[in-house]
């Protein structure tokens, strides 16, 4: 009998703690959502207009993809050549001497 009462106390403490955490988290999420809606009314429209304009500018620039001569993988034509870290280190050390 005493063992079952002890188990009930442990389970009830765990359930009440988890229930309290769930209620607190839910309240915080609802408050955060209300704050973002009320403060972002007008600035949200401005941001979306800027995003639309930026999207139009990006779509007008056409970037062609060409195969890389070393690897054979396709990459943007405007991309710069990558240098190996060991080669860069060797080049910098040779210039210092």
Curated annotation (Swiss-Prot):
Tissue-level expression reads: Expressed in roots, stems leaves and flowers, but not in seeds. In short days, observed in cotyledons and roots but absent from rosette leaves.
Where in or outside the cell is it found? Mitochondrion
Q: Does the keyword Secreted apply?
A: no
Major localization class: mitochondrion
Q: Which residues, if any, are the signal sequence?
A: none
Transit peptide limits: 1-46
Positions of disulphide bridges = none
How does a null allele present?
Early flowering and senescence, as well as reduced shoot biomass. Short primary root with reduced lateral root formation and short root hairs. Enhanced sensitivity to the fungal nectroph, Botrytis cinerea and to the virulent bacterial pathogen Pseudomonas syringae pv. tomato, but normal resistance to an avirulent P.syringae strain.
Please report a single Pfam family linked to this protein: LEA_3a
Under the heading InterPro entries, the entry gives: LEA_3a
What switches on expression, per the entry, is described as:
In short-day conditions, follows a diurnal pattern of regulation, with transcription repression in the light and activation in the dark. Induced by oxidants (e.g. hydrogen peroxide H(2)O(2), menadione and paraquat). Accumulates in response to abscisic acid (ABA) and dehydration. Induced by ethylene, more strongly in the younger leaves than in the older ones. Up-regulated 12 h postinfestation (hpi) in green peach aphid (GPA; Myzus persicae Sulzer) infested leaves. Triggered by cold, wounding and salt. Strongly induced by the necrotrophic fungal pathogen Botrytis cinerea.
One GO cellular component this record assigns the protein to is: mitochondrion
User: Which keywords fit this entry according to its UniProt record?
Assistant: Mitochondrion, Plant defense, Stress response, Transit peptide
Biological process terms from the Gene Ontology for this record are: cellular response to water deprivation; defense response; leaf senescence; regulation of defense response to bacterium; regulation of defense response to fungus; regulation of leaf senescence; regulation of photoperiodism, flowering; response to abscisic acid
Q: Which PANTHER family match?
A: LATE EMBRYOGENIS ABUNDANT PROTEIN 2-RELATED (PTHR33509), PROTEIN SENESCENCE-ASSOCIATED GENE 21, MITOCHONDRIAL (PTHR33509:SF5)
Q: What does this protein do?
A: Mediates tolerance to oxidative stresses (e.g. hydrogen peroxide H(2)O(2), diamide, menadione and tert-butyl hydroperoxide) by minimizing the negative effects of oxidation and monitoring photosynthesis during stress. Promotes root development. Prevents premature aging (e.g. senescence and flowering). Involved in resistance against compatible pathogens such as Botrytis cinerea and Pseudomonas syringae pv. tomato.
Similarity remark: Belongs to the LEA type 3 family.
Q: Write down what this protein is called.
A: Protein SENESCENCE-ASSOCIATED GENE 21, mitochondrial
Q: Which organism is it from?
A: Arabidopsis thaliana
């Amino acid at each position: 009998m005493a063992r079952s009462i002890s188990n009930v106390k442990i389970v009830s403490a765990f359930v009440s703690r988890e229930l309290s955490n769930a209620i607190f988290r839910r309240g915080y999420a609802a408050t955060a959502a209300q704050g973002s809606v009320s403060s972002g009314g007008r600035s949200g429209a401005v941001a979306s207009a800027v995003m639309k304009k930026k999207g139009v500018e990006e779509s007008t620039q056409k970037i062609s993809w060409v195969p890389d001569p070393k690897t054979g993988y396709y990459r943007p034509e405007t991309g710069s050549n990558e240098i190996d870290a060991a080669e860069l280190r060797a080049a910098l050390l040779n210039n210092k001497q």
